[in-house]
Amino acid sequence: MGAGHSHDHPGGNERSLKIALALTGTFLIAEVVGGVMTKSLALISDAAHMLTDTVALAIALAAIAIAKRPADKKRTFGYYRFEILAAAFNALLLFGVAIYILYEAYLRLKSPPQIESTGMFVVAVLGLIINLISMRMLSSGQSSSLNVKGAYLEVWSDLLGSVGVIAGAIIIRFTGWAWVDSAIAVLIGLWVLPRTWFLLKSSLNVLLEGVPDDVDLAEVEKQILATPGVKSFHDLHIWALTSGKASLTVHVVNDTAVNPEMEVLPELKQMLADKFDITHVTIQFELAPCEQADAAQHFNASPALVGSKSLAAGGN
């Protein structure tokens, strides 16, 4: 019996993402050239950050395109994990770039080169404008799409990097302190590293089928036991195919006095959808725990368990 399901379909955000990607990608090239010409490590480090923005935007676009592909006999879950693999690659790339920037900044702090502050300022201001336009393009979709929200946050963080480079250019222009450029690069690198770790950690959690970060497992267990007609449960598993697509399977021992399919199942479905936004659910009902049940994963609402017959009710 189906326990109900819903699948999110990609929204109409392709146009905004394509425009933001075109703007960011074009300016990325200009910023690298500007960083080399002005000898500004801060500009180059900001360009490295903008590279990750470009990759993030490309991932968001690819995810929308790939999500439209139906599941097939080879990949019955579809192609959602592509987004997670790409995010993990993006995190590793960003980590390597950040380490290189910190190392290069260390070398430059010992012997600061002459910085062309005017060119550095102009390029950084252009970057700020590009980021503001990209944020405006993505703002309407970031509240309804996790893909777009991720890209929006990437652009937002790069905007902060542009502000830092502008501040550095002004300081160098009026003080001549060339070391400020390397100091700004260090700050950008230190800003990027924690984000890299969180992105990699979240990606690995999905790939290892861990409980999604936004789901409180203890609260799910509590709410299942609080559902009328549930005596106990075991083998509860919660994971995500990709961000925002949580799935749940569980074996529920029901009270013999209730009809699980007609009374308990609708309550569990509604509770999981309303409280935890989990709509991809498979539930197996039993009158007693199955022999394969893991005692460590068995949770009782009542000490009395009777019967041996089991029936299943699932959904996707």
Curated annotation (Swiss-Prot):
One of its GO terms (cellular component) is plasma membrane. The keyword Membrane applies. InterPro entries: Cation_efflux, Cation_efflux_CTD_sf, Cation_efflux_TMD_sf, CDF/SLC30A. Gene3D superfamilies: Cation efflux protein transmembrane domain (1.20.1510.10). Necessary for activation of the czc determinant. One of its GO terms (molecular function) is zinc ion transmembrane transporter activity. It is a multi-pass membrane protein. This is Cation efflux system protein CzcD. The chain crosses the membrane at residues 17-37, 47-67, 82-102, 115-135, 152-172, 174-194. It comes from the Bacteria. It is found in: Cell membrane. Belongs to the cation diffusion facilitator (CDF) transporter (TC 2.A.4) family. SLC30A subfamily. The lineage of its organism: Bacteria, Pseudomonadati, Pseudomonadota, Betaproteobacteria, Burkholderiales. Keywords: Cadmium, Cell membrane, Cobalt, Ion transport, Membrane, Transmembrane, Transmembrane helix, Transport, Zinc, Zinc transport.
